[in-house]
């Protein structure tokens, strides 16, 4: 992602006549939508990195579709973080799901995933631990004030809608 944004920044300098809309999208949730993140929510317990809140931000599929339409049409150029208001730490997500959290030290998770992936027991590797440990919390202020779109659903509402649709 960083490399792509650097290339886009270079293009803005070398071709200022071109407009760009860069969307940094949080985790997308919608009815019937399943991905690597939602896979984690279907498990018996949620895994957390000890000492990290592992906050999640979500955007509802309907909101994302509206944002994409605006970006392709009359929306302004710029860089925008796309997510609903608020962030949910993994413990709040677990509470909403009625599931326990197993918090493990980062080194234990890295070691376990380093063994599990080569054995075909996990699709995730040790590099995923940093992703859980340092999840980005996007600020959607520019999306609302500059881009002109306020998501209909907050991160919490989006998660609730997805959870209900997923039967959890």
Language-model features, listed with the residues they occupy:
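NAD(P)-dependent short-chain dehydrogenase/reductase
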Residues: 11-61
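Mid/C-terminal beta-alpha module of Rossmann-like enzyme folds, strongest
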Residues: 67-124, 140, 159-163
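Conserved C-terminal active-site "lid" loop/helix of NAD(P)H-dependent oxidoreductases
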Residues: 61, 89-92, 118-150
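Residues that recognize and position ribonucleotide moieties
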Residues: 21, 57, 86, 102, ...
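Amphipathic terminal alpha-helices
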Residues: 142-145, 150-168
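Conserved catalytic Lys-bearing alpha helix of Rossmann-like short-chain dehydrogenase/reductases
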Residues: 1-8, 61
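Glycine/proline-rich active-site loop of Rossmann-fold NAD(P)-dependent oxidoreductases
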Residues: 2, 16-18, 29-39, 70-80, ...
């Amino acid at each position: 992602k960083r490399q792509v944004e650097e290339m886009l920044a270079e293009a803005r300098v070398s071709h200022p006549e071109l407009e760009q809309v860069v969307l940094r999208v949080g985790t997308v949730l919608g009815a019937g939508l399943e991905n690597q993140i939602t896979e984690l929510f279907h498990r018996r317990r949620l895994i957390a990195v000890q000492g990290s809140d592992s906050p999640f931000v979500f955007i509802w599929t309907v909101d994302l579709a509206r944002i994409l339409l605006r970006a392709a049409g009359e929306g302004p150029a710029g860089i925008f973080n796309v997510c609903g208001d608020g962030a949910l730490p993994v413990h709040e997500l677990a509470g909403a799901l009625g599931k326990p959290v197993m918090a493990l030290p980062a080194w234990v998770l890295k070691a376990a995933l380093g063994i599990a992936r080569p054995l075909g027991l996990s699709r995730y590797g040790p590099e995923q631990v940093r992703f859980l440990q340092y999840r980005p919390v996007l600020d959607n202020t520019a999306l609302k004030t500059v881009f002109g779109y306020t998501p209909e659903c907050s991160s919490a509402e989006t998660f609730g809608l997805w959870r209900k649709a997923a039967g959890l």
